[in-house]
């Protein structure tokens, strides 16, 4: 009897070990696709493992902040969620999506406690340092499946160095709705609690449109789950964007101009250093920028850091288009191509195939997560500079947000 119990215990332990390895390597083992049209191919998606959770956050009542031109702060709050959670779990390779005024990260259940603590900490930081209110939640994937939905993930290769998660199945949208209803909440952290925001950066100035306007677009299925007609809509929009240079990418191929935002540098210093060390952090940032500019102008690397290569990688590693139970993209598009996109969207809306929101602005914003500038896997989150996805979403739901002024 004792031997049988021992054997059973050993087998269970081995199975637990195997499960841990599977959880840790799950996303890395999802097959890559490199043509964005693949977001509509169900064969590219894999269901999240049982026992996983969704860590979610978004800004509550972003209207006043957008009207005041503080969308860079809103974007930074959204990106800080990704930075805080990934740093709390050792920067593992887990699926996430940036939504402009919020974010979602999928994690194994074994990391739920770390994610809860990180979300609670970033909520306090956003409130105390940015003056914004962040709503947070942890939703079990099993609960989405109990509703007849699913959370399936695909892995899109934006460049040879960075992949981004695409989500399909209705589960993430359901989880977001539950969060906004006040369910699956997380206890508040103590005042003064600070998350680990190492790598969070927002130094770049807004990136002006070169072809016409920077347009943020959201399109989601009209009723029920997306069918072939919705897939055709997404493919049609993507096809139009590919007719322009670099698929209507809002960031130039050789990277953004070497223009930096003083306001953004101040934000970054507040995010990555405690109150007593922020002046020192600003000086470090200015020194890093000076070195980057000199190395770029002279075309010489500094050790393993190559400024010209880094700037090109910024463009290649940017997430200007994504799929999260619907299409989201921020593109640089001319009037003729935009008109064709709007025609497709309006026809789909009239037929009940899709709901959509669209917002035009003069430039794009970029908020970054750079674990180390030496490595080439730095990530850059793109949104419109004057309200972006938040304003597009408001137009989809029928709410009215004030037009945001140009932000620096």
Q: Where does each model-flagged region fall?
A:
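Regulatory and interdomain segments flanking nucleotide-handling catalytic cores
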Residues: 2-408
């Amino acid at each position: 009897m004792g031997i049988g119990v021992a054997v059973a215990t050993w087998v269970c332990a081995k199975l637990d070990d195997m499960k841990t390895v599977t959880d840790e390597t799950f996303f890395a083992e999802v097959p890559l696709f490199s043509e964005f049209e693949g977001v509509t191919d169900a064969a590219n998606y894999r269901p999240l493992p049982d026992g996983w959770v969704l860590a979610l956050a978004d800004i509550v009542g972003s209207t006043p902040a957008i009207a005041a031109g503080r969308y860079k702060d809103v974007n930074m709050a959204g990106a800080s969620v990704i930075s805080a959670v990934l740093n709390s779990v050792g920067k593992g390779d887990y699926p996430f999506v940036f939504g402009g005024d919020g974010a979602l990260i999928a994690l194994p259940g074994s990391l739920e406690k770390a994610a809860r603590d990180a979300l609670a900490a970033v909520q306090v930081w956003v409130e105390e340092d940015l003056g914004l209110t962040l709503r947070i939640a942890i939703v079990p994937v099993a609960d989405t499946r109990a509703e007849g939905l699913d959370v399936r993930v695909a892995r899109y290769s934006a460049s040879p160095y960075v992949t981004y998660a695409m989500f399909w199945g209705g589960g993430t949208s359901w989880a977001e709705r539950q969060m906004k209803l006040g369910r699956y909440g997380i206890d508040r952290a103590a005042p003064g609690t600070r998350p680990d925001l190492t790598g969070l950066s927002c130094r770049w100035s807004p990136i002006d449109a070169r072809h016409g306007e920077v347009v943020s677009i959201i399109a989601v299925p009209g009723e029920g789950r997306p069918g072939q007609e919705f897939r055709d809509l997404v493919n049609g929009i993507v096809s139009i964007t590919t007719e322009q240079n670099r698929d209507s990418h809002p960031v130039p191929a050789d990277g953004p101009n070497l223009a930096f935002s003083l306001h953004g540098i101040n934000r970054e210093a507040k995010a990555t250093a405690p109150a007593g060390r922020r002046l020192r952090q600003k000086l470090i940032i200015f020194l890093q920028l000076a070195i980057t500019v000199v190395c770029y102008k002279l075309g010489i690397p500094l050790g393993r850091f190559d400024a010209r290569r880094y700037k090109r990688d910024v463009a290649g590693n940017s997430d200007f288009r994504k799929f999260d139970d619907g299409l989201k993209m921020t593109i640089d598009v001319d009037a003729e191509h935009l008109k064709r996109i709007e025609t497709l969207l309006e026809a789909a809306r009239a037929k009940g195939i899709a709901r959509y929101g669209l917002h035009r602005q003069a430039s794009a914003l970029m908020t970054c997560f750079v674990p180390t500038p030496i490595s080439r896997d730095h990530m850059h989150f793109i949104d419109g500079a004057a309200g972006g996805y938040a304003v597009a979403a408001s137009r989809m739901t029928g709410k009215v947000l004030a037009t945001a002024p140009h932000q620096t």
